[in-house]
């Protein structure tokens, strides 16, 4: 059985990147929450 995590920078950016987050209302809420919390990295 293969491992479930097969790293890919492109897929990671497309699924969890800044533009992917900002594309939806809920994604914008995630970024806003992380900003309020003071996270150094907002998205992947």
UniProtKB/Swiss-Prot annotation:
One of its GO terms (cellular component) is ribonucleoprotein complex. Pfam families: Ribosomal_L34. The keyword Disulfide bond does not apply. One of its GO terms (molecular function) is structural constituent of ribosome. GO terms for biological process: translation. InterPro entries: Ribosomal_bL34 (IPR000271). NCBIfam families: rpmH_bact. Belongs to the bacterial ribosomal protein bL34 family. This is Large ribosomal subunit protein bL34. It comes from Caulobacter sp. (strain K31).
């Amino acid at each position: 059985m293969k491992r479930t995590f097969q790293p890919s920078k492109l897929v990671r950016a497309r699924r969890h990147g800044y533009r992917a987050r900002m594309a939806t209302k809920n994604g914008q809420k995630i970024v806003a929450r992380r900003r309020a919390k003071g996270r150094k990295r907002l998205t992947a």
